[in-house]
Design a protein with these regions (language model features):
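Extracytoplasmic small-molecule ligand-binding "clamshell" domains
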Residues: 19-104
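Acidic, polar ligand-binding/catalytic clefts
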Residues: 68, 72, 77-144, 212-213
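Short helix-initiation/N-cap motifs at beta->coil->alpha
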Residues: 26-28, 64, 80-91, 137-139, ...
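Beta->alpha turn/N-cap motifs
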Residues: 42-47, 81-86, 97, 101-109, ...
Length: 280
């Protein structure tokens, strides 16, 4: 589903789409959102198939559709606000406020929960790799990757870079600014490995025969993706959690997983726990 962007707030014009501190402190978040008729959603737009921004300004992806369902249940429209992995935390905590919540591939971690609010998980996740299909048999473990001759490419500021820095002491780690460009760079031979997620890897394998994800069924970590927001928005957090629970109960969350080719991890769980084994 492509969602037309009602208003795009560029990185150079956040002042036009910030939320006044007085209005935030004066009344509950949901009341403020419904009165203005719009929920502002921060998203990176670089993470297929969870959040991607097309050149014409439309957004699509699993997380974008979850955001759409939150807006639908609130009875408001959506305004997407660009953020990035290096600036995500700062953007959530910014004064004046830049957006109401952030969505799209954001892993639930203890560190994030210490300073911000995170919803229950709506998508299982874990670290894995992309490599060239011709070399898939070469990589059977993390030890096979952690060698000086292996070029490992990651995007800056997120958990992919953090995982690489903490677990790869010998590999040649290359930081590339645009996450969405890394798969094609691996396919072209400009890097050997991309550290990515089990949510992202299948999309690129399905769309590029030069790529493979040989460790997809053996992720290095196990976690959950959730919705991120600043502290003090407890009413909005409760509403988001209830939306996730209702989507599980009515089957719409399962259908979204099937639409995007993602593994549904909630068959025995009607109320998702954090299921988090990733600590920042």
């Amino acid at each position: 589903m492509l969602l037309a962007v009602l208003t795009i707030c560029g990185t150079g014009s956040f002042a036009s789409c910030t939320i006044s501190e007085d209005s935030v402190s004066a009344r509950p978040t949901i009341e403020r959102i419904t009165q203005k008729g719009t929920i502002t959603v921060g998203t990176t737009g670089d993470y297929r198939p969870l959040s991607f921004r097309e050149p014409d300004g439309t957004y699509w992806g699993f997380g974008i559709e979850v955001a759409g369902e939150i807006a639908r249940r609130l009875g408001v429209s959506i305004q997407f606000v660009p953020t990035s992995w290096p600036t995500l935390t700062a953007d959530v905590l910014a004064e004046p406020q830049k957006f109401d919540l952030a969505i799209g591939g954001i892993t639930i971690t203890d560190a994030r929960r210490e300073t911000m609010l995170m919803s229950e998980g709506y998508l299982a996740n874990g670290k894995t790799i992309l490599c060239r299909a011709s070399e898939a048999d070469r990589y059977k473990s993390l030890a096979d990757i952690d060698k000086p001759e292996v070029r490992v490419m990651v995007n800056p500021g997120g958990l992919n870079e953090k995982f690489a820095n903490e677990n790869l002491t010998h590999a040649n780690i290359i930081v590339h600014q645009k996450n969405e460009e890394i798969p094609s760079l691996v396919a072209k031979g400009q890097a050997d490995i991309m550290i990515t997620e089990i949510t992202e890897a299948p999309y690129y394998v399905q769309n590029d025969p030069l790529l493979a994800a040989p460790l997809l069924n053996e992720p290095f970590t196990h976690g959950m993706i959730g919705v991120l927001m600043r502290k003090g928005q407890d009413d909005l957090l409760r509403m988001v959690n209830e939306t996730i629970r209702q989507m599980k109960a009515d089957g719409s969350l399962r259908r979204l997983h099937e639409k995007y080719g993602l593994v549904y991890a909630f068959d025995n769980d009607t109320r998702s726990t954090h299921c988090n084994q990733i600590n920042e």
